[in-house]
């Protein structure tokens, strides 16, 4: 059985994007994302897929949830439902859910783990948000705090959660 993991960077007001772009540039967060997801399945919505600057993420099996699978081309696997996406991924030991909002909302009910980057600021201009999480259902496995520096304009924390049994 695969582990279903949500991966996301979010601001204090749960902001995750504006006009289909990230709100910040945190190189260490991008490096962590790449290290965790490389070699695994990544599941995302169509808008998230379309926002990727280079299209499908390399060295990962890209699954896109969309009601228009015929429009997705050959760089990814198009699935109509989360259930179908998970069936396509069942051979992988860990499946990463990488957004957007609706996909995260659906995944919260079934996820085993969350890898969240908590960015210590708010973005009032955001138009895309991570769903509300009932953190009482989650146990913190690890926390790694990072101050702002010359490459990272905001302080942030990498927090790994696992669902309480």
In which residue ranges do the predicted regions lie?
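Extreme N-terminal starter segment of soluble prokaryotic enzymes
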Residues: 1-6
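Flexible, gly/pro- and Lys/Arg-enriched active-site loops
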Residues: 8-41, 46-165
């Amino acid at each position: 059985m695969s582990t279903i993991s949500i991966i996301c960077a979010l601001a204090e007001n749960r902001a995750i994007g504006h006009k289909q772009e990230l709100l910040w540039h945190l190189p260490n967060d991008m490096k962590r994302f790449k290290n965790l997801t490389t070699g695994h399945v990544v599941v995302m919505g169509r808008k998230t897929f379309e926002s990727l600057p280079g299209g499908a993420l390399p060295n990962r099996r890209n699954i896109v949830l969309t009601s228009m699978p015929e429009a997705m081309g050959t760089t990814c696997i198009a699935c109509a439902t989360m259930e179908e996406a998970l069936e396509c991924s069942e051979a992988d030991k860990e499946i990463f859910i990488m957004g957007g909002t609706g996909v995260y909302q659906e995944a919260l009910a079934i996820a085993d783990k969350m890898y969240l980057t908590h960015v210590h600021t708010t973005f009032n201009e955001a138009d895309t948000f991570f769903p509300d999480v009932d953190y009482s259902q989650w146990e913190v496995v690890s926390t790694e705090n990072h101050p702002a520096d010359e490459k990272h304009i905001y302080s942030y924390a990498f927090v790994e959660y696992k669902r309480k049994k």
